[in-house]
Amino acid sequence: GQQINSKFIGAVFASALLLANLAAAEPQHGIAMYGDPALPHDFVSLPYANPNAPKGGTIVSAEGGTFTSLNPHVRKGSVPWQLRFLAYESLMGRSYDEPFTLYTLLAESIETDETRRWVEFSLHPEARFSDGSPVTVEDVIWSYETLGTIGHPRYHGLWKKIETLTQTGPRRVKFTFAAEDRELALLVGLRPILKKAQWETADFENSGLDIIPISSAPYVIRDFDPGNYVRLMRNPEYWGKDIGFRRGTNNFDEIRLDFYADGSVQFEAFKAGESSSFRELNAERWENSYDFDAVQTGKIVKSIIPHQRPSGITGFVMNTRKPKFADWRVREALIAAFNFEFINQANTGGRQERITSYFSNSVLSMEAGPAKGRVLEMLEPYADSLMPGTIEGYRLPQSDGSARNRKNIRAADALLSQAGWTVQNGLRRNVEGLPFEITVTLKQGDTESQSMMDIYQQALERLGITLTTEVLDSAQYKERTQVYDFDMAYYRRGLSLSPGNEQMLYWGSYGLEQPGTRNWMGMNAPAAEAMIAKLVSSSSREDFLAAAKALDRILTAGRYVIPIHTSSISRLAHIKEIKYPKRLPMYGDWIGFLPDVWWYEAP
C-alpha cells in the first residue's frame, strides 16, 4: 500500500505542476511586475478615466525651448517629449494607478510563464495604422530590430537582452530572453511600433522634420512650424477607441504645443489666454502671482493634484569625472555650503520641501539611521567600496536658516582642508597650487537656478572658491551635457515606483564614457549596479523594496548632487472649460494625465 500511495501522491503532484504551468501560460489581459493586475479582463476604463467624457475641443500647451525633429525614436535632434506618449503606441499600455502594471493595447493578449524567460503576444485583429493599413507581426519585429540597433540609445539595452524574436502565428510574436530578469516581459510591451513599409527607402536614423513616422496612435501630427508649434489632431478613425484601456481618454479633438523661449514668457502667454494650462513649480508664486483678472473672475481655476511618486533628484550635479569632485569630502563640503534653508526662504518664502533622498516621499525611500535587516544584508558584501554613511546612516547637512550658515561653512572648510584644498592668499588651492574654480552650466530661462547660484556664489567666496555660471540655449545645453562637458549643472531625474532596467542608464558605469546616458555625475559604483540587478531579478515584493532602499542609500550617501526642493503635489492652473476626473491616479500629474484623461466642456 505504501508504494502505491507515494506513486499516487507523485502523480497528483506532477499533474498539479502541469496545471500550474498551463495556468501561468494562458493568454492574459495584463501583466504586473508583482502579483496580478488590479483590473479584471473586461474592465470598462482605467479607474482614473471618465468613460463618459465628451469628445471635442482644443487644448493648447505652452512649452519651453524649441524642437528640431519630430522623430522621438532616434538620438538626433530635440523632440517635443509628449510625442512619444501621444503620437505612438505599443503592444501594451501602462496604468498609472498601479506601481507597474500593463494592459493589452496593440496586443489582444499576453502570455508568459512563472520564470518569465519568454513572452508571447497576440496582435489585436482590429489594430490599424493611421493610414488604414493593418499592424502586422512584421511591423513589430522590424520596429524592435531597428530601434534596438539604430534607434535612440534608450532602446539598445533591452535589445541586447532579447535572445530570439519570432513569428509564431499569423498574429503572434514571441520573445525569449538571454537573461533572468522579470522586468523584461513588461518592457517589451512598451516599445513603439512603427510601420516597416514607410522606411524601406527612407533614412530612419537621420530623419527629423522631413518624414513624420506613421503610427497607430489616437493622435496624428497635422502640421507644424519648426521651433514654434506642433498641432496634433485626434484620428476620427482611430482603431482602438472602444477598448477598455482607451475608453474615456484622448478626448480633445486637437492638441497644440506652442514653444516659448523661457518660463516667464510661457507664464505671460498663459495669463494672456494663449494657452490652456500652466504647471506652477514655484510655491511662492502660486500663493502670490495668481491674483490677475482671469483667476478673480473664475475663468482660470487653480487645481492641486497630489501624488505618491518618489521625489526623484533635482539639484546641481557634480561631475566626478573632473578630479576636483572625485573626493567625497569635497562634495560633502559643497553640499554643506549650499544654504538650502536660507535659499528656500529667499526664493519661495520657505514653502518648498527639500529632497532628502532619491526615492523620498515614497515606500522605496531609505529609512533614517543605520541599515537593518534585508537592506543591510544586501549592502554588507560591498561595505569596503561604499561611501561613509551608506550603512551607518546619512543625512543632508542642515543650516539654522541664517544667511551666514556658520556651522556648515566651518564644517565645509575642515572637509576641504582634509581633502588637500587649503586657503593660500585668500584662495582655496590644492597641493599643486591650482585654485578651486567651478563653472555651473544652466539652461537659458532658468531664472530660479540663477538666483540660487547668486546666493551660493557668496557662500563659496567665503571658502575661497570661485563660482561662475554659464547660460546656454537648450540645444547647446543638451549637446554639452550629453557628452558630460561641464563642472556642475542643473539636473533633474524623475523616478517611478517601479525602478528597474532604466536605472542602469541613470547610474551604470558604462555612462562614464558612453554619451547620452543620465549618469551625468560619472558614477562608478559596483554596489549600485548590484542593487539594480536585484531590483529586476527579485521575485518577491519584499526583496524588491529592500533593493530599492539599498540603492537609495548608495545614491544619497554618494553625495553626487546638491539637492533642492520637491513637492508631493502638482499645482496646475487651467482654463475652466477643461476638466479632469475626481478619481486621481497614484502617479498624479504625470505621463498619462494631462491631456490624456482631461476633456473640454463648453460653458
Annotate the PLM regions.
Residues 27, 45-46, 65-82, 106, ...:
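A structural "hinge/loop" feature
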Residues 28-30, 63-65, 79, 86, ...:
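Detector for C-terminal structural segments
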